[in-house]
Amino acid sequence: MASLLKVDQEVKLKVDSFRERITSEAEDLVANFFPKKLLELDSFLKEPILNIHDLTQIHSDMNLPVPDPILLTNSHDGLDGPTYKKRRLDECEEAFQGTKVFVMPNGMLKSNQQLVDIIEKVKPEIRLLIEKCNTVKMWVQLLIPRIEDGNNFGVSIQEETVAELRTVESEAASYLDQISRYYITRAKLVSKIAKYPHVEDYRRTVTEIDEKEYISLRLIISELRNQYVTLHDMILKNIEKIKRPRSSNAETLY
């Protein structure tokens, strides 16, 4: 096979070194890292911050007081009301040029700090799972032998393992999208409250979204733990077929 394709020996040595490094790292991940991480996440799920039953405890102050109602009075001193108001408003607009913005009486509108704290702990865990799955997936792909007739049952197990790892990667990436959507949706609602401070439904919707996100974050952590459990169990049960899909595997590997 080597005679069919000329390969630079120096490059070949570097590629072989890369394969050995991936193999060593992936086997350590499956044997040691996955079980340790699932226990760590299981412990995280038992922390008080993730076991709040009264969800009103995670509500945050909107920092947007309801303004006093505007009282309209009759015009006096012979001034025509609408015309006089329009002239005064025109004078103000001429004095202050630029983009119109809503003035927040109490400063910046902050996020729900309790949820932000949880999110900042969850995001690194999501990224870590994606990275580790990618390493293990590469390892299994490198173990797949060349295509040929015969008993390919072991190869099908390898392919199913790769597919499962790819699915876990995609699901983990979707968790990051979910977090981004939460921030965007909440920001739009808070902007609505700033514009329509007297509408109570907007304020209630923000608290509903915060409660929903809290439940979702706990579910994400639970799913991360379960994915480590599933991958560890699946690979260990099929490790023989994954590493040696065919009896002549040593001769048929690329």
UniProtKB/Swiss-Prot annotation:
The modification Phosphoserine is found at residues 17, 24, 247. The modification N-acetylalanine is found at residue 2. SUPFAM superfamilies: Proteasome activator (SSF47216). Keywords: Acetylation, Apoptosis, Cell cycle, Cytoplasm, Host-virus interaction, Nucleus, Phosphoprotein, Proteasome. InterPro entries: PA28_C (IPR003186), PA28_C_sf (IPR036997), PA28_N_sf (IPR036996), Proteasome_activ_PA28 (IPR009077), Proteasome_activ_PA28_N (IPR003185), Proteasome_activ_sf (IPR036252). Subunit of the 11S REG-gamma (also called PA28-gamma) proteasome regulator, a doughnut-shaped homoheptamer which associates with the proteasome. 11S REG-gamma activates the trypsin-like catalytic subunit of the proteasome but inhibits the chymotrypsin-like and postglutamyl-preferring (PGPH) subunits. Facilitates the MDM2-p53/TP53 interaction which promotes ubiquitination- and MDM2-dependent proteasomal degradation of p53/TP53, limiting its accumulation and resulting in inhibited apoptosis after DNA damage. May also be involved in cell cycle regulation. Homoheptamer; the stability of the heptamer is essential for the specific activation of the trypsine-like subunit and inhibition of the chymotrypsin-like and postglutamyl-preferring (PGPH) subunits of the proteasome. Interacts with p53/TP53 and MDM2. Interacts with MAP3K3. Associates with the proteasome. Interacts with CCAR2. Interacts with PSME3IP1 (via C-terminus); the interaction is direct and promotes the association of PSME3 with the 20S proteasome. Interacts with COIL; the interaction is inhibited by PSME3IP1. The C-terminal sequences affect heptamer stability and proteasome affinity. This is Proteasome activator complex subunit 3. It comes from Homo sapiens (Human).
